[in-house]
């Protein structure tokens, strides 16, 4: 699966969870996003390091890799990423729709 698609889904999941009292950790797993544990760890670590999310700690120690969830939330940068990518998807669908109905295109 494309990394950026997984990143979008992770951010979207966190954004939707901001309306809930408690974060649903049960469905916030590598398996739920269709990636390996290793890829999930590194994608989350990148999102934290680049300032898209807070409330997640990614720890790599001798005994393994651990993701610690402490009330995950999007930062403004994370919200902007979601907004920009949502607009890009809409523009893509619009352009594709125009192409589909345009003869000879």
What are these regions (language model features)?
Residues 33-56, 69:
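Short amphipathic alpha-helical interaction segments
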Residues 3-32:
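Short amphipathic alpha-helical interface segments
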Residues 62-97:
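Short, amphipathic alpha-helical interaction segments positioned at domain boundaries
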Residues 25-26, 30, 59-65:
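Short, surface-exposed loop/turn segments at secondary-structure junctions
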Residues 3-4, 20-22, 37, 88, ...:
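Alpha-helix N-cap/helix-initiation sites
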Residues 11-17, 47, 82-85:
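Generic structural signal for hydrophobic core residues of well-folded globular domains
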